[in-house]
Amino acid sequence: MAEPAGSNAGEPPVIELRNVSKSFGEVRSLSGVNFKVNRREIVGLLGDNGSGKSTLVKVVMGFHTPDPGGEIYFHGKRMDEWSVAKARSLGIETVYQERALCEKQPIWRNMFMGRELRTRLGLLDVNRMRAEAARLMREHMGFTSAAVHPSNVVATMSGGEKQGVAITRALYFEAELVILDEPTMGLSLSETKKTLDFVRNIKEVGKSAIFIDHNIFNVYPVVDRLYVLDRGKVAGVYNRSEITMDALIERLYHVARTGTLE
């Protein structure tokens, strides 16, 4: 299969899982999974409940370590130690479906929560954070301060705009890889469109993303490649440019019915 559009010749993937399995007692959630995300690539992750999507993503996030024999590589370097702290220190950020924003706080405070900018004296640099928030909203979200001011309370924003804040926050802190955990759940059609535009922007600024969603109609238009998981195994990997949505839906249906691509 040809290299995906997001790949860069000669560059190792941002993250790569090789032969990763994960068991919990007698239950095997992942079995021999090979998975990678290249720089400037958006990778979709599809599969029914129980297919292994959540476990795979939690391995990438550092919540789970692979069973013996599985390996994780970051920019081509094998990771002998893997944890949430390690993954985050390398620039792996997650945008959850709940968005993890403080509704009663202003936009600028949400963008810098836990990583506040400070003056040389160690005081909170409120003016700088407001100015940076305005710049980020303009560059990443397409908002002018006249339309949506950084001092506006998050609760006044739409669902799609809130996802934009969460994604922009991740990008500001030099995220190499943004994990999007069903970011369109519960959103209207118009807000879903806004969110998908924010997802596309991740690639435009040179970063990568994993997009998890149950809705193929949301995933297909924005990804470069798609992994289909079934019962803990990779049932298929597709370049979007090489498969139509109708053909992909047929294959997903076949996998769900038979557990194979044959």
Segments the model singles out, each with a brief description of its role:
Residues 2-262:
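Glycine-rich phosphate-binding loops of nucleotide-dependent enzymes
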